[in-house]
């Protein structure tokens, strides 16, 4: 065993037992080559039955708990006023403190409703780093999604503890240059999915809120992975080591005016999301949009049993035994990959390991999409499906036919929650 291999810590013990299983099968390289050709080398076009280890996303791929499945049997499918809505309302209020919320079928629908209610053509929405659906929803409304990630977050080799932080000085300079009247809201994505799953510090959340509120600009979190971010704060930020994660989460939300959330991440379910806020006028507008796009405000495109599963999952995810396992098991894969000599974003994020395709494949220029090439090779050689987070996803086409490449060329290996064991990871 090499010195590098000896430094890799053991895989954490899973804090759960497995009750239901789903068969998967290994394919041959020849089979996978044919699959790739049929799919046009687009991994989104590959049928799930042809994937051995599917690390494309952690969204909606979690294994639900026995409590969540039991809750599904309590689904109240009344069109209006189902009891599951009020159970979810209680869960959201107890964790976030927000007074109002509307359920949606997933996170991008919550973004759609929010930006439809707030963004006018020509306005800008600053963030640490918008993910692709958030960016697309802002652009669809005629707005400009602006990324102001701190410089440390753009260096895959940096070991800074909070590489998801926004550059607060640049944020204030941007507000002054653009004009507060042209910024309907500001956002932070926690954790920063487009930038390596890196967390945002409490100090940065607080400072961002102070800057935005100084100019009367509402502040929203993209809270898909709020529990993972809260646990990183507990691990890495001075003063929080003894603070329960639920209290850290409440403090995170206390500096903001609302949030969007895909419940398919840190609510441990397969479908669902919500938009929450304190502004009653915004809530009323959101309800009107919801009825047109999603459904009545007490179901929002979801069955009652889905609402119940989300309510249970929002609290389950705050179990520190689970979070310890979740963060450490991701770090375990990162350590293994790094020990094998593959450049990755360091330190490991909460939900995924990000391979640095730009460093691994320096001979492939950005305009030939090195991260997409690497993702295809991972599937071709091992049957593992990841996803490109680079110029295919975030490149900006120009009128002259050229393209501004993404800041980083990454392949994300997102680990579904409570789904794979150490044998799969190894």
Predicted regions and their residues:
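Conserved PLP-enzyme active-site core in the AAT-like
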Residues: 2-41, 45-64, 68, 77-101, ...
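Short glycine-rich or small-residue beta-strand-to-loop segments that form or flank ligand, phosphate
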Residues: 75, 260, 412-416
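Conserved alpha/beta core surface patches that mediate binding of polyanionic ligands
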Residues: 169, 291-295, 384-398
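Short, conserved charged micro-motifs
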Residues: 284, 362-370, 418-425
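Short acidic (Asp/Glu) and glycine-rich catalytic loops that position anionic groups and cofactors
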Residues: 287-290, 307-316, 351-360, 406-412
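PLP-dependent enzyme catalytic core of the Aspartate aminotransferase-like
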Residues: 317, 393-426
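Conserved glycine-rich beta-strand-loop-beta hairpin in the small C-terminal domain of fold type I
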Residues: 330-331, 345-357
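Active-site loop ensemble at the mouth of alpha/beta enzyme cores that anchors a bound cofactor
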Residues: 358-385, 399-406
């Amino acid at each position: 065993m090499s010195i590098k291999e000896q430094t890799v810590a053991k895989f954490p013990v899973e804090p759960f037992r497995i009750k239901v299983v789903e068969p998967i099968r290994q394919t041959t390289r020849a089979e996978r080559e044919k699959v790739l050709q049929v799919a046009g080398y687009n991994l989104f076009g590959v049928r799930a039955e042809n994937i051995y280890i599917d690390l494309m996303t952690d969204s909606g791929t979690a294994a639900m708990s026995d409590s969540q499945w039991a809750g599904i049997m309590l689904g109240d499918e009344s069109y209006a006023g189902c009891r599951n809505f009020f159970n979810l309302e209680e869960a959201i209020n107890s964790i976030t403190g927000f007074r109002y919320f509307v359920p949606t079928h997933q996170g991008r629908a919550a973004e759609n409703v929010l930006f439809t209610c707030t963004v006018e053509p020509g306005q800008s929405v600053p963030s640490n780093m918008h993910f692709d659906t958030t960016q697309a929803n802002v652009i669809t409304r005629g707005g400009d999604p602006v990324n102001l990630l701190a410089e440390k977050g753009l260096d895959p080799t940096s070991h800074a503890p909070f590489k998801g932080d926004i550059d607060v000085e640049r944020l204030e300079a941007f507000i002054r240059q653009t004009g507060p009247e042209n910024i309907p809201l500001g956002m932070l994505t926690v954790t920063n999915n487009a930038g390596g799953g890196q967390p945002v510090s409490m100090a940065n959340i607080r400072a961002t809120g102070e800057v935005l509120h100084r100019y009367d600009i509402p502040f929203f979190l993209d809270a898909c992975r709020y529990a993972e971010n809260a646990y990183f704060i507990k691990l890495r930020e001075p003063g929080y080591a003894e603070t329960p994660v639920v209290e850290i989460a409440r403090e995170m939300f206390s500096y903001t005016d609302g949030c969007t959330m895909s419940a398919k991440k840190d609510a441990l379910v397969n479908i669902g999301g919500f938009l929450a806020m304190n502004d009653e006028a915004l809530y009323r507008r959101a309800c009107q949009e919801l009825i047109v796009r999603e459904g009545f405000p007490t179901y929002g495109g979801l069955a009652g049993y889905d609402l119940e599963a989300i309510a249970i999952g929002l609290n389950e995810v705050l179990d520190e035994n689970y979070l310890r396992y979740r963060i450490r098991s991701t770090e375990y894969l990162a350590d293994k990959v790094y020990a094998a000599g593959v450049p990755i974003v360091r330190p490991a994020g909460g939900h995924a390991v990000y391979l640095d395709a730009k460093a691994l494949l320096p001979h492939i220029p950005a305009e030939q999409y090195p991260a997409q090439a690497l993702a295809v090779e991972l599937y071709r050689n091992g049957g593992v499906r990841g996803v490109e987070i680079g110029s295919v996803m975030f490149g900006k086409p120009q009128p002259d036919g050229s393209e501004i490449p993404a800041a980083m060329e990454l392949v994300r290996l997102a680990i579904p929650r409570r789904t794979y064991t150490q044998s799969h990871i190894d």
